[in-house]
Amino acid sequence: MSAAVAAPARTRLTHLQRLEAESIHIFREAVAEAENPVMLYSIGKDSSVLLHLALKAFAPGRLPFPLMHIDTTWKFREMIAFRDRRAKELGLELIVHTNQDGLAKGVGPVSHGSEVHTDVMKTQALRQALDKYKYDVAFGGARRDEEASRAKERIVSLRNGQHRWDPKRQRAEPWHLYNFKKRRGESFRVFPLSNWTELDIWLYIEQENIPIVPLYFAAERPVVERDGQLIMVDDERFPLEPGETPQQRQVRFRTLGCYPLTGAVESPAATLPEIIGETLAARTSERQGRVIDKDGAGAMERKKQEGYF
């Protein structure tokens, strides 16, 4: 009589493996349903993780969609250098779109303020690009833990013909089943990182050795303190107020955007383990440094309803 064959031990996925598997599943489901998908690439840590997951989802083949960056022309110089370097290293199709009307009118965060700048150079620019290339599914790196309006948005988010989000038209997503049925002109924003936290992102970056913009690591940088924020003076376009002089301080960024609208934090964290340690101890949102989130009550939800990322 032959000996009984032992049943294989049941493999348990780690927390990060479960998140990774869910994100890869979302990518594959969305691409299977999409007619013309695109990935919105904002260059930050979440976009870097999103890109890494997309490459895993479709390996060993090429990405079945391009990356698109909405360039306001006010991103940190290190962000643009990182974007171009990564696209070249990975052989990616990268589309860069800028609202030329806004650029011609000189719309910027300093001259027009954060609300007008964000609307013209981000929201309107994104709607222009989606219409121009006729994308019906746009992947984004938003996470539910970032901000209240993002917390209630579905993984597959229906947008109307003007790319607007209506919270009342959200669809149920039971058992990871996603509804991609749409009317003519409608489209979807898809968020594979919805269930990740800031800590998950940093742990995954460390585990997978994912390249990120150096601005996330602490270094001596020229900053001015304005309205309670440490703003890095990244180029000569930033006007100094009377008596204001940039000071070299040890800072890093928890989140990245247009540099005049993004506050740094004083920190000695120059390695991933140190950043993870700070994240574990943090008692404030990573978006505390985003000036655009302070454009009045419900600012982010209002922006999303107008077509924002």
UniProtKB/Swiss-Prot annotation:
InterPro entries named among the record's database cross-references: PAPS_reduct_dom, Rossmann-like_a/b/a_fold, SO4_adenylTrfase_ssu, Sulfate_adenylyltrnsfr_sub2
Keyword Ligase included in the entry's annotation: no
Record GO biological process: hydrogen sulfide biosynthetic process; sulfate assimilation
Record GO terms (molecular function): ATP binding; sulfate adenylyltransferase (ATP) activity
NCBIfam families the UniProt entry points to: CysD, PRK05253.1, PRK12563.1
Assembly mode: Heterodimer composed of CysD, the smaller subunit, and CysN.
Family, as annotated: Belongs to the PAPS reductase family. CysD subfamily.
Name assigned to this protein: Sulfate adenylyltransferase subunit 2
Protein's gene: cysD
